[in-house]
UniProtKB/Swiss-Prot annotation:
The gene is clcE. Keywords: CBS domain, Chloride, Chloride channel, Ion channel, Ion transport, Membrane, Repeat, Transmembrane, Transmembrane helix, Transport, Voltage-gated channel. It comes from the Eukaryota. It comes from Dictyostelium discoideum (Social amoeba). Residues 644-705, 944-994 form the CBS domain. GO terms for molecular function: voltage-gated chloride channel activity. Coiled coil: none annotated. It is found in: Membrane. Residues 859-870 have a biased composition (Acidic residues). Residues 11-32, 717-764, 809-822 have a biased composition (Low complexity). Voltage-gated chloride channel. Chloride channels may have several functions including the regulation of cell volume, membrane potential stabilization and signal transduction. Gene3D superfamilies: CBS-domain, Clc chloride channel. GO terms for cellular component: chloride channel complex. This is Chloride channel protein E. It is a multi-pass membrane protein.
């Protein structure tokens, strides 16, 4: 084969290869049709995901550049203002300003706003609410080693040292309060036993011995004893309600709902007052002595918080009150000690105080609560030996040998939790209905005394009728349920039938639950924790007796079930796990930890399934603001944009002083949002109200001072010049008169010639500038009448200007035109009248003619015609700025000097006052100054937070709730790409039905 043939064959093979490849591809495509996954992929590949050809990369870069550098028109001055706010020098000025304004009414309103006036949320994490001296924990080094007194004083002035002194003092005072209440209750219990001593055998003796039960039910009741019992209860209930009606109505109830609201950031000043403390203690003691089914835990916690607030009002601990964060920590310590003074459980008391009242808790501050609780517990246990004979015992011990738990026992614990959870939910439902029923009718709402008398009467009758076990105090009944023996005395004798044992406990449970629901609704001081603990113990004892008799349960004794159900019923009502801890401390049985926790968790879950907790329900009914942790499913579908307030009032960096003053007069906001400009609406920060008021006052004072200095300096010099000119004019007039007389005596012809020459000169001279008051006077005799009319029309306040042309001068005299400098002198009266002006003009004319001086106004030789009085002025008033011309006259020569008036008055680097702005007063000067320039001038500091709390407008509402609860926020701003679009306050979230 030749070379040419080979090339042809290669070309044919190469031309046929594409056909073969295409056939192979077709075969592959035929096989791919039956592959659904590949078909779907090919379908998505054909979709145009960017039909509008949007440059996403460029858009992303634009958004990133927006957040990093702001908008394109954000000028350099704004950046300079922000950098100045962040400088250390400006922060030092902020500290000095804060020390000046912290005693003002506006600044105190940021933390002392009364709830009765307005709901004002306190942002306890905002740096504007803290005293800068409280932020430093380290003690500054004192170089002078000899000043030990100064060093010790500085050391004591720190927040940490004052806290260490405050906490033990608080714990001791609360423990003493608990001891006093125990002593009063013991004495009142003894008095009650004494007045009912006719059948005292039915009451459990205080010496611990077991009474002998009577043989029949009828022997357990006596008419006289019943009347005395009921009268005793009604009398002390009357004293309790009188404390509310006549001392302080804020002591009503347990006080825990109010403390929850206070710990949320709401200021309730009267709730923590001294009158409330007296009413709370006296009312609680009397209500407990009356035999009403109420508890002491809530009132103790409320009273402890009041003691803490009163201690912080002392000058020694004044630094603690200034810092909101430390103040809330001390309130938590007080609430903890209140629980310890009631139950003697420091660990459970701290957890209970945090879980019940606080929305958030800083774990690093728990040591403060433990320190206060330990101090109270030490005094509490030391005092128990003294008051061991009383009816009230805060610690209940029983003998229990732990055994192994089986699956059946665990199921039993869960079953008890379910039952206690259902009972707790039903109790909350009944409580809400009773409170709303009372509030529905005005007669029940207003007649406190009558309502308490009626309810206490029926409560005493029911309590006495329910048997001896229901008549004893709650702590004594708790000791009976946790004991190894049967609860005594009985309403029904056990020897008649074994079911009477269950019936006794069932009667106690039903009676106490009903009485608790009715008694805690009354307007008296009283809580519900202790009745739940005792009733739960009775319920657990009933379960334990049934399991022991019918199912031969040996793992846990009936007393153990009493402790388990006690924690379960409390958790099912208030929906907290912490009661399980202090129940363990009450009983001293840590072996029951797992059963109690199982029961408490189950009870809490069951109760939450039906309704809100007891204290949250009370908050909702009372209308107290509080962010509850129990919210509906709406918060997961809504955004911040749907709940924000859109019509927000703000100021910008370009706002003038007038606008800022009007804003402060119109709105009483504690914090004011600041944006860069009304067009961009970029949030720069927030400003404290009192700081802005202080800044405006300082700025206005500085500007007014500069204006007064300028006016006083100028007018003094001007008056001196006027006096000198007048004296010189008088001397010149005298000299001219003498010269004229001599000339008349010597040569009459020459005198006549001189007079003619003087007249010609006066007629030919068109204009003459006189530097007496900085104005130009008309010397033409033909215009004297017009000048007089001009003076009369302007009341000698303004002087007309002279133009080169006679017609122009006359028109100006009629028009009353004056220079800007003359406008400044409107308030000053000139000392020159018309006659003085005429004499001065003649004197100058004679002087110029006699001395042979050239006239001030130069004339052209060609235009020296009487009909054409066109002259070229030496100084053109149209082209030059106003000048101050001072004339110094002597006997031989007259010299004229010109001193230019400065265009602006220098104030500082940011402001220069224009002469034109002075004619309308100081407000026309400082009223136009803007906020950015005032900050840049550095006259005084502005308390400004450059990083306020803000959330995007599409943030889920659930996250917004978490931010408010975890950070303790009072408000947060809503932004869209950095622009301020709205605000969300804590009150607005509280008002939402979520």
């Amino acid at each position: 084969m030749t070379r040419k043939e080979n090339e042809e064959s290669e070309s044919l093979s190469s031309s046929s290869s594409p056909i073969d490849n295409s056939n192979n591809n077709n075969n592959n495509n035929n096989h791919s049709i039956f592959n659904p996954i590949g078909h779907i992929q090919n379908a998505f590949n054909n979709i145009d995901l960017n039909p509008l050809n949007v440059d996403f990369k460029g858009h992303t870069d634009k958004v990133v550049n927006f957040f990093q550098h702001g908008t394109g028109d954000l000028n350099d001055r704004m950046q300079g203002v922000v950098s100045k706010l962040r400088s250390n020098e400006y922060r030092k000025k902020m500290h000095s300003v804060l020390t000046k304004i912290k005693d003002t009414k506006e600044y105190k309103s940021t933390s002392n706003t009364d709830y009765d006036v307005i709901f004002e949320s306190v942002d306890m994490y905002s740096n504007l609410q803290q005293d800068p001296t409280m932020d430093k924990d380290e003690i500054d080094v004192v170089t002078d080693l000899s000043s030990y007194k100064k060093k010790f004083t500085h050391w004591l002035g720190k927040e940490r040292i004052s806290t260490l002194l405050f906490i033990p003092t608080l714990g001791i005072l609360i423990a003493l309060m608990g001891i006093l209440c125990d002593f009063l209750l013991m004495e009142l219990g003894t008095l009650r036993d004494f007045v009912t001593s006719r059948h005292n055998s039915h009451v459990i003796p205080t010496d611990g011995t077991t009474p002998t039960p009577n043989s029949s039910i009828a022997d357990k009741y006596d008419l006289v004893e019943g009347i005395v019992f009921v009268g005793y209860s009604v009398f002390f209930a009357l004293i309790s309600v009188c404390c509310i009606s006549f001392i302080s109505p804020y002591a009503v109830g347990s006080g825990i709902p109010e403390m929850k609201s206070i710990m949320s950031g709401i200021n309730l000043s009267r709730v923590l007052g001294f009158k409330t403390l007296v009413s709370k203690i006296v009312g609680m003691v009397c209500a407990s002595a009356a035999g009403l089914t109420i508890g002491r835990t809530g009132p103790f916690m409320h009273a402890s918080a009041i003691i803490s607030q009163m201690l912080m009002n002392l000058k020694v601990f004044g630094a603690i009150k200034k810092n909101q964060i430390v103040r809330y920590q001390m309130l938590i310590c007080a609430l903890t000690s209140g629980v310890v003074a009631n139950f003697g459980a420091p660990i459970g008391g701290l957890l209970f105080a945090i879980e019940v009242t606080a929305t958030t808790a800083v774990m690093g501050n728990l040591w403060k609560g433990f320190l206060c609780a330990t101090t109270t517990a030490i005094i509490f246990f030391l005092s128990r030996s003294t008051f061991s004979k009383g009816n009230f015992h805060s610690v209940y011990e029983f003998e229990f040998v732990p055994k192994e738990y089986g699956v059946a026992d665990l199921i039993t614990f869960v079953g008890i939790g379910i039952i206690t959870g259902l009972i707790g939910a039903f109790f909350v439902f009944i409580y809400e209905k009773l409170v709303r029923f009372r509030l529905r009718y005005p007669i029940l709402k207003q007649s406190r005394i009558i309502l308490v008398l009626v309810v206490s009467l029926f409560s005493a009758i029911i309590t006495y009728s329910a048997g001896p076990l229901c008549r004893v105090s709650l702590p004594t009944a708790m000791k009976q349920f946790l004991g190894q023996n049967e609860p005594k005395p009985f309403l029904f004798e056990q020897d008649q039938t074994p079911y009477y044992k269950y019936l006794n406990l069932l009667v106690f449970i039903v009676v106490k639950l009903i009485l608790t629901a009715f008694n805690i609704v009354l307007p008296i001081p009283g809580g519900a924790i202790t009745p739940f603990i005792v009733t739960g113990a009775a319920l657990g004892r009933l379960f334990g007796e049934i399991l022991k008799d019918h199912f031969d349960s040996q793992a846990i004794e009936p007393a153990g079930f009493a402790a388990i159900a006690s924690a379960g019923l409390v958790s099912g009502t208030i929906r907290n796990i912490s009661p399980s801890i202090f129940v363990l401390e009450l009983t001293g049985q840590l072996s029951l930890l797992v059963p109690i926790l199982i029961c408490s968790i189950t009870s809490t879950a069951v109760g939450n399934f039906f309704n809100r907790p007891l204290f949250d329900t009370a908050l909702k009914i009372q209308g107290l603001p509080f962010l509850s942790n129990y919210r509906s499913s709406k918060v997961y579908t809504m955004t911040a944009k749907q709940v924000m307030k859109k019509n927000i009032n703000y100021l910008s960096m370009t706002s003038t002083v007038i606008e800022m003053k009007n804003f402060l007069d119109t709105f009483k906001y504690t914090f004011i949002p600041i944006v860069d400009s009304k067009e961009n609406m970029l949030l720069v920060g927030i400003v404290e109200r009192s700081s802005m008021i202080y800044m405006l006052d300082i700025h206005i004072e500085n500007i007014e001072q500069k204006i007064d200095e300028f006016k006083s300096k100028y007018f003094v010099n001007n008056n001196n010049n006027n006096n000198n000119n007048n004296n010189n004019n008088n001397n010149n007039n005298n000299n001219n008169n003498n010269n004229n007389n001599n000339n008349n005596n010597n040569n009459n012809n020459n005198n006549n010639n001189n007079n003619n020459n003087n007249n010609n000169n006066s007629n030919n001279s068109e204009n003459l500038e006189i530097e007496n008051t900085g104005a130009i006077l008309n010397t033409n005799s033909n215009n004297n009448n017009s000048d007089e009319e001009d003076y009369d029309r302007k009341d000698n306040d303004k002087i007309s200007l002279i133009k080169p042309n006679q017609d122009e001068s006359s028109s100006n005299s009629n028009g009353g035109s004056s220079s800007d400098f003359e406008e400044i002198l409107n308030t000053q009266n000139t000392n020159i009248n018309k006659n003085d002006n005429e004499d001065l003009i003649k004197e100058i004319e004679d002087e110029n003619s006699s001395l042979g001086e050239k006239p001030i106004i130069e004339h052209d030789d060609e235009d020296d015609d009487e009909e054409e009085g066109d002259g070229i002025p030496l100084v053109s008033m149209k082209d030059q700025q106003p000048v101050l011309r001072n004339r110094h006259t002597t006997t031989t020569t007259t010299t004229t000097t010109t001193t230019p008036i400065t265009e602006n008055i220098y104030v500082n680097d940011a402001f220069e006052i224009s002469i034109n702005d002075l004619k309308n007063g100081g407000q026309s000067v400082w009223g136009k100054h803007i906020l950015g320039d005032i900050i840049h001038s550095g006259e005084t500091a502005l308390l400004m937070d450059l990083a306020p709390s803000q959330v995007p407008d599409l943030t889920p509402l659930n996250k917004v709730f978490h931010l408010f609860t975890m950070l303790g926020l009072g408000f947060t701003y809503v932004t869209s790409l950095g622009k301020l679009v709205g605000v969300i306050t804590k009150n607005s979230l509280m008002e939402q039905d979520l």
